C-alpha cells in the first residue's frame, strides 16, 4: 500500500480564518471527516475551530446546484422538518443559518399553534407556544449548511471517494487517517477533482491512498463500517440495540391550495401501540405539501393515488386525507423501507483506538417519522465541541459517552410506540405503570397548557424526560377531571391508544443543551 503524506502541504499551511477561532484552542494540524452528511458538515464546522485544516470526504458526487438528493440519504425526498432543539442548535453552530433558510423559502412557525399533533386517539390542543420549528426539504437544509461550512476557509470537501478503511499505527492503538479510493476517473468526477487536487489527492487514478489526520470522525451514517474496521484490528465487537417495527413509507407531494389547512403548517398523526398506521403532512419551501404515510409491522402504504387517499382517510384526524383528496398531486410517489431503529453502543466499548470517533446515524438512527435525526446530529455536533474543549486525550471514550447522552431521549421516543406493539416482548411492571401515566398526561394536556408545554419540551429535545415527573405536573395529571382547571377548551377524547416507552423515557439521561 502506498502510504503517502498526501496532505503534507496542507499540514504546513496555516489557514487565515476558521469557525469562531477566538473561542477554541488549537488541537492539531488536520482533522478528517468521513461523510458529507448533515452530521459530517456540522462536525466539520466544529472541528474548524480546533484544527488548521478540516477535510470532508464524501462518497457521493456533490453538485453545486440545489435540487438533487444524495444517494446516501434515501429518505431525503420524504417529509422533513427541524425540531426546536435542532433549529436552535444549528443556529448556534452556524449563526445566520435560520434566516438563510427562511430567505430561501423555509417555513418558520409555532410547533403547537401551527401544527396539529395526534397521538393514538388523543389530539393535542393548539395554542401559540413560542416553540418555533422550521420546515424545509432535506436538500435545501443540507445545501444551505454545506454552503456555510464551505465558506470556512480551512474546510475542504471532496466527493467521489470510497473509504477503504482506517490507517493505524504499528501497534494499532492510534488511528492515523483513512485509506481512500477514487471512484471515478478525473474526466468523470466533475467538480470533485478540484477539491481533491486542493487536498493533495490523486484525481486520475483508482489507486488506494492514505489521508493523514490528527483526528478522524466517522459520519458515514447508518452504513458506517467503523465497527467492522475495529473488529478487523482486534478490538471488541460493538453492542447493537435494534427495534425493528418493519416500517414502510410512501411520500407524495401535493400543490398547496387556498382553503386547505390554511391555519396549519404541519399535521402529524402517530399510531397507538396496537396500531400500525400513521401519517404526516408538512409545508415545504416550493409551495407543496409533502404527505408521508407510514405502515408498520408488515403493513405497506400504497403508492397509487386513490389507494393512497383511502389509506389517509383511515387515519384518526382528517387533515392528511384532506390534502391528498383536495390538492393537486405533483411528481411521482417515493417509497422508503426503514430497516429499524438501531443504536450502536459505542459508549460501552471496553477498548478502542485513539483519535477516532463516530457521530450521527453511525451511532444511532431513528424511525424517521419522528423527525429527530437532524436535530440529534446537531446536538451531537455541539457535544463534540464540549469534548474537544477538554483536548484529545481519551477523546473516543469521552465522545462516545457524550453522544450517547444526546441519543438517549430521541431513541426512547422513537422506539417507544414500537415496543408497545403486541408482537414485542412484554415490558416490566414499572414501565407499564409509567406508560399509563404518560397516557393520562396526554389526555389531561388537552385541557392544560402547562402539561402540553412540558410534553412538547421533551418531544422537541429541550427538556429531559424525567421533567415530566415534576411534582406539580404529577399533581395536574392525577387531579380528577372535574377539579382540573380548564385552561383550554377541548372535546372529551375516547380512551387513548398511545405509544411511548415511558419506563425508559422517564429514566433517560438529561441532555446538556446549553452548556
Predicted region positions:
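FAD/FMN-dependent oxidoreductases across multiple families
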Residues: 299-383, 387-410
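Short beta-strand to alpha-helix junction loop
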Residues: 81-82, 128-147, 219, 225, ...
Amino acid at each position: 500500500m502506498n502510504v503517502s503524506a498526501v496532505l503534507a502541504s496542507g499540514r504546513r499551511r496555516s489557514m487565515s480564518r476558521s469557525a469562531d477561532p477566538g473561542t477554541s484552542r488549537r488541537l492539531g494540524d488536520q482533522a478528517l471527516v468521513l461523510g458529507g452528511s448533515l452530521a459530517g458538515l456540522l462536525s466539520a464546522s466544529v472541528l474548524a475551530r480546533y484544527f488548521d485544516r478540516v477535510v470532508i470526504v464524501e462518497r457521493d458526487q456533490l453538485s453545486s446546484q440545489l435540487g438533487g438528493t444524495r444517494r446516501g440519504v434515501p429518505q431525503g425526498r420524504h417529509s422533513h422538518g427541524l425540531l426546536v432543539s435542532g433549529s436552535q442548535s444549528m443556529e448556534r453552530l452556524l449563526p445566520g443559518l435560520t434566516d438563510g433558510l427562511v430567505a430561501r423559502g423555509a417555513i418558520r412557525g409555532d410547533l403547537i399553534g401551527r401544527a396539529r399533533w395526534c397521538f393514538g386517539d388523543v389530539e393535542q390542543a393548539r395554542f401559540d407556544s413560542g416553540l418555533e420549528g422550521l420546515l424545509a426539504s432535506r436538500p435545501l437544509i443540507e445545501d444551505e449548511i454545506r454552503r456555510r461550512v464551505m465558506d470556512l476557509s480551512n474546510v475542504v470537501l471532496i466527493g467521489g471517494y470510497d473509504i477503504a478503511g482506517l490507517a493505524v499505527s504499528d501497534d494499532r492503538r492510534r488511528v492515523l487517517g483513512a485509506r481512500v479510493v477514487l471512484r471515478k476517473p478525473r474526466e468523470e468526477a466533475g467538480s470533485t477533482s478540484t477539491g481533491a487536487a486542493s487536498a493533495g489527492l490523486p484525481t486520475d487514478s483508482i489507486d488506494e491512498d492514505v489521508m493523514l489526520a490528527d483526528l478522524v470522525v466517522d459520519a458515514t451514517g447508518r452504513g458506517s463500517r467503523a465497527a467492522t474496521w475495529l473488529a478487523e484490528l482486534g478490538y471488541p465487537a460493538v453492542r447493537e440495540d435494534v427495534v425493528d417495527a418493519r416500517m414502510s413509507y410512501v411520500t407524495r407531494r401535493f400543490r398547496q391550495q387556498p382553503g386547505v389547512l390554511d391555519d396549519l403548517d404541519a399535521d402529524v398523526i402517530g399510531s397507538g401501540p396496537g396500531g400500525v398506521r400513521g401519517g404526516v403532512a408538512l409545508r415545504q419551501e416550493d409551495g407543496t405539501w409533502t404527505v408521508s404515510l407510514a405502515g408498520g409491522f408488515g403493513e405497506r402504504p400504497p403508492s397509487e393515488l386513490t389507494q393512497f387517499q383511502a389509506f389517509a382517510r383511515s387515519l384518526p384526524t382528517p387533515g392528511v386525507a384532506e390534502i391528498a383528496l383536495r390538492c393537486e398531486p405533483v411528481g411521482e410517489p417515493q417509497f422508503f423501507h426503514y430497516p429499524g431503529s438501531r443504536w450502536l453502543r459505542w459508549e460501552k466499548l471496553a477498548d478502542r483506538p485513539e483519535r477516532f470517533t463516530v457521530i450521527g446515524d453511525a451511532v444511532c438512527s431513528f424511525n424517521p417519522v419522528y423527525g429527530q435525526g437532524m436535530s440529534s446530529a446537531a446536538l451531537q455536533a455541539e457535544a463534540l465541541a464540549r469534548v474537544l474543549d477538554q483536548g484529545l486525550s481519551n477523546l473516543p471514550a469521552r465522545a462516545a459517552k457524550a453522544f450517547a447522552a444526546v441519543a438517549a431521549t430521541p431513541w426512547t421516543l422513537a422506539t417507544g410506540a414500537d415496543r408497545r406493539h403486541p408482537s414485542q416482548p412484554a415490558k416490566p411492571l414499572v414501565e407499564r405503570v409509567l406508560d399509563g401515566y404518560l397516557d393520562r398526561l396526554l389526555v389531561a394536556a388537552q385541557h392544560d397548557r402547562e402539561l402540553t408545554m412540558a410534553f412538547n419540551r421533551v418531544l422537541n429535545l429541550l427538556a429531559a424526560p424525567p421533567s415530566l415527573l415534576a411534582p406539580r405536573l404529577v399533581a395536574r395529571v392525577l387531579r380528577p377531571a372535574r377539579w382540573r382547571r380548564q385552561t383550554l377548551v377541548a372535546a372529551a377524547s375516547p380512551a387513548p391508544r398511545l405509544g411511548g416507552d415511558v419506563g425508559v423515557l422517564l429514566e433517560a439521561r438529561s441532555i446538556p443543551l446549553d452548556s
